[in-house]
Swiss-Prot record:
Belongs to the ADIPOR family. Non-classical progesterone receptors involved in extranuclear signaling are classified in 2 groups: the class II progestin and adipoQ receptor (PAQR) family (also called mPRs) (PAQR5, PAQR6, PAQR7, PAQR8 and PAQR9) and the b5-like heme/steroid-binding protein family (also called MAPRs) (PGRMC1, PGRMC2, NENF and CYB5D2). This is Membrane progesterone receptor epsilon. InterPro entries: AdipoR/HlyIII-related (IPR004254). Residues 106-114, 182-203, 263-299, 363-375 are extracellular. GO terms for molecular function: steroid binding. Keywords: Cell membrane, Lipid-binding, Membrane, Receptor, Steroid-binding, Transmembrane, Transmembrane helix. GO terms for cellular component: plasma membrane. The gene is Paqr9. The keyword Nucleus does not apply. Its main location: membrane. Pfam families: HlyIII. It comes from the Eukaryota. Residues 1-39 are annotated as: Disordered. The lineage of its organism: Eukaryota, Metazoa, Chordata, Craniata, Vertebrata.
Length: 375
């Protein structure tokens, strides 16, 4: 059976032998019909190349190769990729409308090109790009094996780009308001609670200096790991990708520590509620992405509607929705008493450099002979 119908190492039994490609002796003598889309628009798992088969998804596959026009038309047909597209295309439109209101229709005295909004531009570009690339990858994944790999490499890169853009927004809009990163608060706090006579000024300065460079390195490393997970050495690609994309979330640890050490719920209830609700949605999304429930329980029943990747999309959308909410609130507080304006090199410059690095990573993997398609 194809290696993609079950997760390697998971010990999951596949379909019975009667469904195998080699169990159709009658089909050998029967005349073959031309592979026209009108003859058989949707295929089963044993009628497509192994590299296109998804875990526990038995039907709903588009014929291969498709043309670009056929790929676009398939978003209105009941395939196993249709809702993968719509569960991110609708959020893309919602967030596009949201950011247009923030930048152009917010009624603020700050123009859209003001340096104070540069971190928001970085964050917005990451959110919109990750949804756009996800839609593109799911729609055009059946053009060819190489293009499928290329689109999903770009999908992984866009997620890393979004993660770094989130860190830029946190760095300028959220972290400065935390007591945890205020030496005037932390120095007496450490002395009172731990009895340590430590001046936290230097430690906090070092942390601030390292946040963006470390997040940058993590973004590149996560993309490399996810691209590598599409090769045959990786037994659990979904678990690996989930883990590596959890790593950049560590950049938000100061907010979590703030809620433990200080009264974040009382001082900033919006941040507290939406921050923890976001991480709840992320945990739920990770559960579905790794477990492959519900299609693992009943293969074939959720091929078109309700399989785990669609649920993963929905819960990641909810997590980003909560994040946008508290980033917007952080922006409002930032504009009330802004410190020094963010620089172009410290915001957009970082993002452009990241684009170059991620492009080089994708180019390296596409030029290698060892690539394989695993969503």
């Amino acid at each position: 059976m194809p290696r993609r119908l079950q997760q390697r190492g998971a010990g999951v039994k596949g379909p019975p032998a009667s469904t195998s490609r080699r169990s159709h002796p009658a089909s050998a003598s029967a005349p073959r019909s031309p592979p026209a889309a009108t003859t058989k628009p949707l295929l089963r798992w044993d009628e497509v190349p192994d590299d296109f088969v998804e875990c526990f998804i038995l039907s709903g596959y588009r014929r291969l190769p498709c043309t670009a026009q056929e790929c676009l038309a398939s978003v209105l047909k009941p395939t196993n990729e249709t809702l993968n597209f719509w569960t991110h295309f609708i959020p893309l439109l919602l967030f596009l409308s949201k950011f247009c209101r923030l930048f152009f229709l917010g009624g603020s005295d700050v123009p859209f090109h003001h340096p104070w909004l540069l971190p928001l531009w970085c964050y917005a570009s990451g959110v919109l790009l990750t949804f756009a690339m996800s839609c593109t990858a799911h729609v055009f994944s059946c053009l060819s094996l190489r293009l499928r790999a290329a689109f999903f490499y770009l999908d992984y890169a866009s997620i890393s780009y979004y993660g770094f853009g989130s860190t830029v927004a946190y760095y300028y809009y959220l972290l400065p308001s935390l007591s945890l990163l205020d030496a005037r608060v932390m120095t007496p706090y450490v002395q009172q609670r731990l009895g340590w006579h430590v001046d936290c000024t230097r430690l906090i300065a070092v942390y601030r200096a390292l946040v963006l460079p470390v997040a940058f390195v993590l973004a590149v490393a996560c993309t490399v790991a996810c691209c590598k997970s599409r090769t045959d050495w990786c037994s659990y690609p979904f678990a690996l990708r989930t883990f590596v994309f959890v790593m950049p979330l560590s950049m938000a640890c100061p907010i979590m520590l703030e809620s433990w050490l200080f009264d974040l719920r009382g001082e900033n209830p919006t941040l507290f509620v939406h921050f923890y609700r976001r991480y709840f949605w992320l945990v739920v999304a990770a559960f579905f992405n790794v477990s492959k429930i519900p299609e693992r329980i009943q293969p074939g029943l959720f091929d078109i509607i309700g399989h785990s990747h669609q649920l993963f999309h929905i819960f990641t959308f909810l997590s980003i929705y909560d994040q946008v909410y508290y980033v917007e609130e952080g922006l409002r507080q930032f504009l009330q008493a802004p410190p020094a304006a963010p620089t172009f090199s410290g915001t957009v410059g970082y993002m452009l450099l990241l684009v170059v690095c991620l492009g080089l990573v994708i180019r390296k993997f596409l030029n290698s002979t060892e690539f394989c398609s695993k969503k």
